Amino acid sequence: MRTSEVHRATRETDITLSLDLDGTGAGTIETGIPFFDHMLASFARHGRIDLSVRATGDLAVDPHHTIEDIGIVLGTALAESVGDGRGITRFADAAVPMDEALARVALDVGGRGYLVFEGDFSPVGPGGIPGDLIEHFFHSLCSHAGITAHITVTGRNDHHICEAAFKAFARALRAAVAIDPAIGDVPSTKGSL
């Protein structure tokens, strides 16, 4: 079973998240940020990851802490569910269009968290979320999951750009964590990720 449940409580947020990497794409998402709920539901569906997120945060201030901490918790849960990486494909990429927008994502689920993000959002991005916060979410996720990600987005509509990015990341992740029976071991010459 490649599952994980993580709880994180700080003075700013309280988050409980569970996931199943080998799920069907079922999502139960409650973050208090409707647009972000939509993005996480898309992530679950297109990654075929069963994902449950219950989050409360200091949204009266702004959505920064909530979105950042969900990235931390999701990354932690992904790292736990992948475990030592035995048998995973490890590398994958995906390109997802959404009308005029296009997102390209290449991943290495190799234990080293790093993000390269190319593309722009409006200062007040999709769903009223500050545009730079979308990139920050992926940075938090990758850092805590031990995933290197290169994300490139183009387009004019912030909603389309963001949704394409979440879907492309999910599809690449699904392929990268897929078990390849031919591998059978940790996919690294070092013997560990």
From Swiss-Prot:
UniProt GO molecular function: imidazoleglycerol-phosphate dehydratase activity
Entry's localization field: Cytoplasm
Cited Pfam families: IGPD
Keyword Lyase listed: yes
GO BP field: L-histidine biosynthetic process
Pathway(s) of this molecule: Amino-acid biosynthesis; L-histidine biosynthesis; L-histidine from 5-phospho-alpha-D-ribose 1-diphosphate: step 6/9
Enzyme Commission no: 4.2.1.19
Reactions catalysed: D-erythro-1-(imidazol-4-yl)glycerol 3-phosphate = 3-(imidazol-4-yl)-2-oxopropyl phosphate + H2O
Enzyme type, top EC level: lyase
A cellular-component GO term for this protein: cytoplasm
Alphabetic keyword roster: Amino-acid biosynthesis, Cytoplasm, Histidine biosynthesis, Lyase
Domain of life from the UniProt record: Archaea
Homology family: Belongs to the imidazoleglycerol-phosphate dehydratase family.
Annotated protein name in UniProt: Imidazoleglycerol-phosphate dehydratase
Organism encoding this protein: Methanoculleus marisnigri (strain ATCC 35101 / DSM 1498 / JR1)
